Amino acid sequence: MLEARDLYCERDERTLFRGLSFTVDAGEWVQVTGGNGAGKTTLLRLLTGLARPDGGEVYWQGEPLRRVRDSFHRSLLWIGHQPGIKTRLTARENLHFFHPGDGARLPEALAQAGLAGFEDVPVAQLSAGQQRRVALARLWLTRAALWVLDEPFTAIDVNGVARLTRRMAAHTAQGGMVILTTHQPLPGAADTVRRLALTGGGAGL
């Protein structure tokens, strides 16, 4: 279980949220919503331990995140707004960097992400959407329980969004957890996703 307890965050003398508390249990996924500048990416960075809140605490499996950082990161898949891939490497080589023991599974993961036939193309030669798919192919490889995804559908077409949404649904059905930001609808998942709305100083589930 991931828990945010009484989080407070201020940026540039402006309160993004205060008193923000919620939990994400096994089998749940949460969509963080809010306007530009509401603090969606900031919240995800707090939840992954990439930044510290100005007040409050994040807990993983009942322990403060700062005390269990190593075990938490072994349970985490974080894909930020920037795909975090190496443009000089091929799609296959990028996945091998993150999943060196899964060589036989890499082509299938890339195919699931819509990159069949692009496995050995340097990422620098791929479109923005294809580069995003290289990062998202990790969803078919990772063994992490918690997925935190910042705008995963950017530059992804409708069919790709549907395929990724099905993968997230399968992950939560198996007891995984997903937290994501997106402005796009989640096809077939509207009734199962909890929405956390950041409203400028507060939030509501």
Curated annotation (Swiss-Prot):
Question: What domain of life does the UniProt record list for this protein's source?
Answer: Bacteria
Gene Ontology MF term list: ABC-type heme transporter activity; ATP binding; ATP hydrolysis activity
Q: Which reaction does it catalyse?
A: heme b(in) + ATP + H2O = heme b(out) + ADP + phosphate + H(+)
What is the protein's membrane topology class?
A: Peripheral membrane protein
Q: Which residues form the ABC transporter domain?
A: 2-205
Family annotation (Gene3D superfamilies): P-loop containing nucleotide triphosphate hydrolases (3.40.50.300)
| CDD domains on file | ABC_CcmA_heme_exporter
**Primary location group:** membrane
Task: State the compartments where it is located.
Answer: Cell inner membrane
Q: Which PROSITE patterns does UniProt cross-reference here?
A: ABC_TRANSPORTER_1, ABC_TRANSPORTER_2, CCMA
Q: What class of enzyme is it?
A: translocase
Q: Which residues make up the binding site for ATP? A: 34-41
Q: What is its EC number?
A: 7.6.2.5
Q: Name one GO biological process term.
A: cytochrome complex assembly
GO CC aspect terms: plasma membrane
Question: What keywords are annotated for this sequence in UniProt?
Answer: ATP-binding, Cell inner membrane, Cell membrane, Cytochrome c-type biogenesis, Membrane, Nucleotide-binding, Translocase, Transport
Give the multimer and partner information: The complex is composed of two ATP-binding proteins (CcmA) and two transmembrane proteins (CcmB).
Q: PANTHER family, alphabetically?
A: ABC TRANSPORTER I FAMILY MEMBER 1
What functional role does this protein have? Part of the ABC transporter complex CcmAB involved in the biogenesis of c-type cytochromes; once thought to export heme, this seems not to be the case, but its exact role is uncertain. Responsible for energy coupling to the transport system.
Which protein family is named in the record?
Answer: Belongs to the ABC transporter superfamily. CcmA exporter (TC 3.A.1.107) family.
Q: What is this protein called?
A: Cytochrome c biogenesis ATP-binding export protein CcmA 1
- The gene behind this protein is ccmA1
